[in-house]
Curated annotation (Swiss-Prot):
Keywords: Glycosyltransferase, Lipopolysaccharide biosynthesis, Transferase. Pathway: Bacterial outer membrane biogenesis; LPS core biosynthesis. The lineage of its organism: Bacteria, Pseudomonadati, Pseudomonadota, Gammaproteobacteria, Enterobacterales. CDD domains: Beta4Glucosyltransferase. SUPFAM superfamilies: Nucleotide-diphospho-sugar transferases. PANTHER family: GLYCOSYLTRANSFERASE, POLY-BETA-1,6-N-ACETYL-D-GLUCOSAMINE SYNTHASE. This is Lipopolysaccharide core biosynthesis glycosyltransferase KdtX. The gene is kdtX. Pfam families: Glycos_transf_2. It comes from the Bacteria.
Length: 257
């Protein structure tokens, strides 16, 4: 029988002192916790260190993908669980992870179902649940891509095995902070697309925006999530509008990017 694989929990963070304690406590059972701080101005570093994390700093921001790559490079154990400060590993998910570590398939990647919080409600529809993300994998085999935002784990043709148990994701606790983050993501998405030679027309802005609302509200049953479902459909449409309008503006030199 093979011995248990060891686990490094890895995260990138900036100004997350308020969220880090519950996050780190939910993974305190791991063999190692790595936090790569990108220049916090609050007590994030001290909080992480006080809870047993190994903290490193890198302020030359080149996007989420490369920051995750660097964070993983500090991990010294067999498996990596990549998480964010606004996520929590539930006891059920921990049990699933422990089962993998006791009987691993190193060629596989394991996905977690995220339960996303939006304005006081953990969403069950709207495309926000189960919201599976590939987060548990063999350290020596897989890395994140270079994308500035919405980065993904490069898994090739690896088998993806779903884990049981949810990961809680406190996505939208503060509406204004959430809006600011969405605007930043839209800007980075448009910048990356523009650099890759992508362009869009005026009509494309409108069709993608309308499509985002219909997809969230109707096709993904957002109406079953009540008021929050309707608000999320509008927010998704707004985010999509910002992405494509920014790409349109960049293509016509209406931006300094």
């Amino acid at each position: 029988m093979s011995s248990r694989k060891s686990l490094s929990v890895v995260m990138i963070a900036k100004n997350e002192a308020g969220l880090l304690p519950d996050c780190l406590r939910s993974v305190a059972w791991a063999d190692e916790i790595i936090v790569l701080d990108s220049g916090s101005e609050d007590d994030s570093v001290a909080v992480a260190e006080s809870l047993g994390a190994k903290v490193f700093t890198h302020t030359d921001w080149q996007g989420f993908g490369k920051q995750r790559q660097l964070a993983q490079s500090y991990a010294s154990h067999d498996y990596v669980l990549m998480i964010d400060a606004d996520e929590r590993v539930t006891p059920e998910l921990r049990q699933s992870i422990e089962r993998v570590l006791n009987a691993p398939d190193d060629g596989a990647v394991y996905s977690c179902a995220r339960r996303n919080l939006f304005l006081g409600r953990f969403m069950r529809h709207s495309g926000w649940y189960p919201d599976r993300v590939n987060r548990l994998y063999a350290n020596s085999r897989y890395r994140y891509n270079d994308d500035l935002v919405h980065e993904l784990l490069n898994i090739g043709d690896a088998k993806v095995i779903p884990l049981s148990g949810d990961m809680l994701h406190l996505t939208c606790r503060d509406f204004f902070a959430f809006q600011r983050k969405q605007l930043r993501y839209a800007e980075e998405w448009a910048t990356q697309r523009h650099r890759a030679g992508k362009r869009c027309g005026y009509l494309s802005i409108l069709t993608h925006t309308l499509g985002a609302f219909v997809k969230t509200w109707l096709l993904r049953a957002g109406f079953l999530d009540g008021k929050q479902g309707l608000l999320l459909a509008v927010v998704n449409a707004q985010y999509t509008f910002n992405k494509y309008a920014a790409l349109w503006a960049l293509g016509r030199n209406y931006s300094e990017k």
